[in-house]
Amino acid sequence: MKQILYKLFEHQYLGRDEARTILQNIAQGKYNDVQVASLITVFLMRNISVEELCGFRDALLEMRVPVDLSEFAPIDIVGTGGDGKNTFNISTAACFTVAGAGIPVVKHGNYGATSVSGASNVMEQHGVKFTSDVDQMRRSMEQCNIAYLHAPLFNPALKAVAPIRKGLAVRTFFNMLGPLVNPVLPTYQLLGVYNLPLLRLYTYTYQESKTKFAVVHSLDGYDEISLTNEFKVATCGNEKIYTPEGLGFARYQDTDLDGGQTPEDAAKIFDNIMNNTATEAQKNVVVINAAFAIQVVRPEKTIEECIALAKESLESGRALATLKKFIELNNK
């Protein structure tokens, strides 16, 4: 590791194979916590390259516990995290909204590393038992239209670095990797990122894959569509900037999206959204993220039509019914 760190300190970049080997060594416990933290710190000081990101991703996918749910052609909706905003669980709520609209979802999530509550915290608050049983996940897809994959069960490297990430409490390149290594390798993905260089990096990375995707970024730094500012959406062949007002929404304040101080606070906000009793800001932010996810799967629909489908899922109670059925099936 010493030679690797010296190389990085001299502002050199890792090759794809080199990055792959480093991640494999981390997963196998060949480096101590201080060495891993030093490596992580380098990538806090500069942007990661496409080659480095692809190499890290190669290692994680090679070591993953594979899950074949390809018959469902599902979508994952995920943010990188690490934007420092402590929002409520927007992408998780959007997942159940999309599933309620009839589109299969495989949510790949983890505990919060830089926020109060990650997707796995919300699931635990609802009594969900995490599993790597593929048959159980297939039943969940068949009966609920959604399955949840707790990342550490499927990737030893993510589990190995979890205490270090929690101790640092800042975004790391593992925030960037999490969305790229859903063990299902979903057919579709909506990914939120916290800055424009990362939006371009993910767009280049996804263009090398078979995944149909959209990468979103709010220009004031959110790793999802926040409706607090203009936002950019990048797909395989297009980039476009939208305004909240142009899509019929108000422009909200940062405080409108606050996730609370505890996992219990975050779970309460999540429940309010599912019960259609949330604030206008909370509801509409979930709707707009769900809408762009729906459009990834159904590109023939206009974004206005997708917004209507997302609203209907929440307002009709179908998103809530999906959540209740999911909890019932997955808390045993």
Curated annotation (Swiss-Prot):
<dbReference type="InterPro" id="IPR036320">
    <property type="entry name" value="Glycosyl_Trfase_fam3_N_dom_sf"/>
</dbReference>
<feature type="binding site">
    <location>
        <position position="223"/>
    </location>
    <ligand>
        <name>Mg(2+) 2</name>
    </ligand>
</feature>
<dbReference type="Pfam" id="PF00591">
    <property type="entry name" value="Glycos_transf_3"/>
</dbReference>
<dbReference type="InterPro" id="IPR017459">
    <property type="entry name" value="Glycosyl_Trfase_fam3_N_dom"/>
</dbReference>
<keyword id="KW-0460">Magnesium</keyword>
<feature type="binding site">
    <location>
        <position position="110"/>
    </location>
    <ligand>
        <name>anthranilate 1</name>
    </ligand>
</feature>
<comment type="function">
    <text>Catalyzes the transfer of the phosphoribosyl group of 5-phosphorylribose-1-pyrophosphate (PRPP) to anthranilate to yield N-(5'-phosphoribosyl)-anthranilate (PRA).</text>
</comment>
<keyword id="KW-0479">Metal-binding</keyword>
<dbReference type="GO" id="GO:0000287">
    <property type="term" value="F:magnesium ion binding"/>
</dbReference>
<keyword id="KW-0808">Transferase</keyword>
<dbReference type="Pfam" id="PF02885">
    <property type="entry name" value="Glycos_trans_3N"/>
</dbReference>
<dbReference type="GO" id="GO:0000162">
    <property type="term" value="P:L-tryptophan biosynthetic process"/>
</dbReference>
<keyword id="KW-0028">Amino-acid biosynthesis</keyword>
<dbReference type="GO" id="GO:0004048">
    <property type="term" value="F:anthranilate phosphoribosyltransferase activity"/>
</dbReference>
<keyword id="KW-0057">Aromatic amino acid biosynthesis</keyword>
<feature type="binding site">
    <location>
        <position position="119"/>
    </location>
    <ligand>
        <name>5-phospho-alpha-D-ribose 1-diphosphate</name>
    </ligand>
</feature>
<dbReference type="InterPro" id="IPR035902">
    <property type="entry name" value="Nuc_phospho_transferase"/>
</dbReference>
<comment type="subunit">
    <text>Homodimer.</text>
</comment>
<feature type="binding site">
    <location>
        <begin position="89"/>
        <end position="92"/>
    </location>
    <ligand>
        <name>5-phospho-alpha-D-ribose 1-diphosphate</name>
    </ligand>
</feature>
<feature type="binding site">
    <location>
        <position position="87"/>
    </location>
    <ligand>
        <name>5-phospho-alpha-D-ribose 1-diphosphate</name>
    </ligand>
</feature>
<keyword id="KW-0328">Glycosyltransferase</keyword>
<feature type="binding site">
    <location>
        <begin position="107"/>
        <end position="115"/>
    </location>
    <ligand>
        <name>5-phospho-alpha-D-ribose 1-diphosphate</name>
    </ligand>
</feature>
<feature type="binding site">
    <location>
        <position position="79"/>
    </location>
    <ligand>
        <name>anthranilate 1</name>
    </ligand>
</feature>
<feature type="binding site">
    <location>
        <position position="224"/>
    </location>
    <ligand>
        <name>Mg(2+) 1</name>
    </ligand>
</feature>
<feature type="binding site">
    <location>
        <position position="79"/>
    </location>
    <ligand>
        <name>5-phospho-alpha-D-ribose 1-diphosphate</name>
    </ligand>
</feature>
<feature type="binding site">
    <location>
        <position position="165"/>
    </location>
    <ligand>
        <name>anthranilate 2</name>
    </ligand>
</feature>
<feature type="binding site">
    <location>
        <begin position="82"/>
        <end position="83"/>
    </location>
    <ligand>
        <name>5-phospho-alpha-D-ribose 1-diphosphate</name>
    </ligand>
</feature>
<protein>
    <recommendedName>
        <fullName>Anthranilate phosphoribosyltransferase</fullName>
        <ecNumber>2.4.2.18</ecNumber>
    </recommendedName>
</protein>
<dbReference type="GO" id="GO:0005829">
    <property type="term" value="C:cytosol"/>
</dbReference>
<dbReference type="InterPro" id="IPR005940">
    <property type="entry name" value="Anthranilate_Pribosyl_Tfrase"/>
</dbReference>
<comment type="similarity">
    <text>Belongs to the anthranilate phosphoribosyltransferase family.</text>
</comment>
<keyword id="KW-0822">Tryptophan biosynthesis</keyword>
<dbReference type="InterPro" id="IPR000312">
    <property type="entry name" value="Glycosyl_Trfase_fam3"/>
</dbReference>
<feature type="binding site">
    <location>
        <position position="91"/>
    </location>
    <ligand>
        <name>Mg(2+) 1</name>
    </ligand>
</feature>
<comment type="pathway">
    <text>Amino-acid biosynthesis; L-tryptophan biosynthesis; L-tryptophan from chorismate: step 2/5.</text>
</comment>
<feature type="binding site">
    <location>
        <position position="224"/>
    </location>
    <ligand>
        <name>Mg(2+) 2</name>
    </ligand>
</feature>
